Amino acid sequence: MTRTFAGRLLIATAACLLVSAPANAALAYVSNEKGNTVTVIDTDRFEAIKTIKVGQRPRGIEVTKDGKFVLVACGDDDTIQMIDTKTDEVTGTLPSGPDPEFFSQDPTGKLLYVANENDNTLTIIDIDKRTRVGNVEVGVEPEGVAVSPDGKIIINTSETTSMAHFIDAASHKIVANVLVGSRPRFAAFKRDASELWVSSEVGGTVSIIDPAKHVVTKKISFAIPGLRAEAIQPVGIAITRDGSTAFVALGPANRVAVIDGATHEVKKYLLVGQRVWHLAFTSDQKYLLTTNGISNDVSVIDVAALKVVKTIQVGELPWGVAMPEP
């Protein structure tokens, strides 16, 4: 009898572990810049289920590779806060520079590269040890950060300098500076590292860079009937895993551009909420979530159908959105 009960208990415990382990796998996290909160969204139902209080002016946001923490850049607190994904509470901080805005992890999930807008530096942080291990001087107003798929190159975009800086991950030295459009905001590698895409908010373009040669091979421009050119401001970029399609948030144009990953031609514009800023795929890449700062909501795009299927109300001035990696 005892042995049978113990066996049942062991099976039940194992089942609980299997259910609870990926508890955050279907969740999305949205940083609300003016609300000083993070909204948690259930991506199975596409509903906001919780609001987490964080520091002042949260912007950049990512889930750690192991899924244990959500990292949030709290610019006015000069720190990166760590939200425990099991408790949804802030349990620690990481030491950034002044006014951290955006960051990216290396492929191992051990290092974090943080753009500090106010002192023109990129801070390198050991996530497990919660210590600063490096600092790189970059251009004026550093913003976007991307890491090459092999982890060997870090990209930082500097808004005022209008450059994408190529930084060697081993030496922490800048190895190339590539001039792009005015006020570059975001950088994203294709999964095969064949291309680097950089959005330029004021320039109104996306530059395609050959990462090996450090040269711009093409600039993508946008034109939307009825909108002035200055209203079209590219910011966030999301590229499908196979590289076939890219989505670009166009800020106050209230559109997301759908771009052919091979030809670099704009295929379609999707109307979303007001001032769309950043975007991220669900883990299966069937849906794309966009943060719409002025309308205080998130648009859900069906990637196959290329249409908005739902709008989710979140906090005040949503900025970034992040989900666990598959």
Model-derived regions: residue spans:
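Bacterial N-terminal signal peptides that target proteins for export
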Residues: M1-I11
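Predominantly soluble domains enriched in secretory-pathway, periplasmic, or organellar proteins
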Residues: A14-P326
